[in-house]
């Protein structure tokens, strides 16, 4: 059966430091965990996008152009892309208050964090975007506008967390993001996801790890698996919350 899981690891920092592709993949993975229709639309969109781009390359290579052939792909790209856009928009709106709630608890600070969903479709509908950028797409030989260019903007007090957030603030934000993901999965599936804490001592001090485990325990998120190279350190942290545990 389906057993949802969420991992918190040092590699989560890439969600802040890397480009938009890593954040898109993360957003897609979060939504797809509980929405099979979204996953289907995403697969169809990516497949059609590849075909449209291949046709644009063919046109340039052979110095030809056929608008009717291109529009065969425009219709499904518009259809699937618009559905994906709407679901991404709704998901970010739904999860944001939970992210803010957990960030306040974890950071014990007064900073206001927010997540802004950036998309070309915020400016115009997909059909118009394809029409307006046709010549540009022909020159570039790929589709320059669409939901495959979307991004999530992580802000703290109106500024980019990537540029203005301290290491501690960035860590707190990422943990809040993952905990919000867990809560969202639980709300939709009525199942407790397994939480995997992978080598978190690498980026968090012992007190912050204890706070995290206590918070998760209070929220009744279910089973927690912790990986660490120092057995004694893990035992010390687990003992603080007085919960049943097993060390392997």
Residue locations for each model-derived region?
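H-loop (His-switch) and adjacent beta-strand-loop-beta switch element
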Residues: 241-248
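Conserved nucleotide-binding/hydrolysis micro-motifs of P-loop NTPases
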Residues: 12-13, 21-22, 120-122, 230-233
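Conserved NTPase motor "head" modules and their coupling/switch loops across ABC/AAA+ ATPases, GTPases
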Residues: 64-194, 203, 207-223, 232-241
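Walker B catalytic acidic pair
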Residues: 198-200
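Hydrophobic "anchor" residues on beta-strands that sit immediately upstream
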Residues: 5, 194-195
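Extended, charged alpha-helical "arm/stalk" segments used for dimerization and assembly
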Residues: 1-55
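Secondary-structure edge/capping motif, primarily at the C-terminal ends of alpha-helices
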Residues: 56-63
């Amino acid at each position: 059966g389906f057993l949802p899981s969420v991992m918190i690891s040092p590699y989560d920092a890439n969600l802040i430091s890397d480009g938009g592709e890593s954040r898109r993949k993360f957003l897609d993975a979060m939504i797809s965990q509980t929405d099979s229709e979204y996953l289907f639309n995403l697969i169809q969109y990516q497949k059609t996008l590849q075909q449209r781009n291949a046709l644009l390359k063919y046109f340039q290579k052979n110095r030809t152009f056929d608008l009717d052939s291109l529009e065969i792909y425009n219709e499904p790209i518009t259809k699937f892309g618009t559905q994906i856009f709407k679901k991404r928009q709704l998901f970010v709106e739904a999860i944001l208050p939970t992210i803010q709630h957990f960030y306040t608890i974890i950071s014990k600070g007064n900073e206001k964090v927010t997540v802004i969903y950036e998309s070309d479709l915020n400016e115009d509908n997909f059909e118009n975007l394809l029409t307006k950028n046709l010549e540009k797409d022909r020159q570039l030989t790929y589709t320059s506008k669409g939901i495959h260019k979307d991004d999530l903007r992580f802000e703290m007090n109106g500024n980019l967390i990537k540029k203005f957030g301290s290491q501690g603030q960035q860590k707190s934000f990422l943990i809040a993001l993952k905990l919000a993901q867990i809560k969202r999965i639980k709300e939709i599936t009525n199942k407790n996801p397994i939480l995997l804490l992978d080598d978190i001592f690498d980026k968090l001090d012992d007190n912050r790890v204890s706070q995290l485990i206590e918070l998760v325990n209070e929220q009744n998120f279910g089973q927690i698996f912790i990986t660490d190279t120092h057995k004694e350190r893990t035992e010390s942290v687990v003992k603080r919350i007085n919960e049943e545990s097993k060390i392997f």
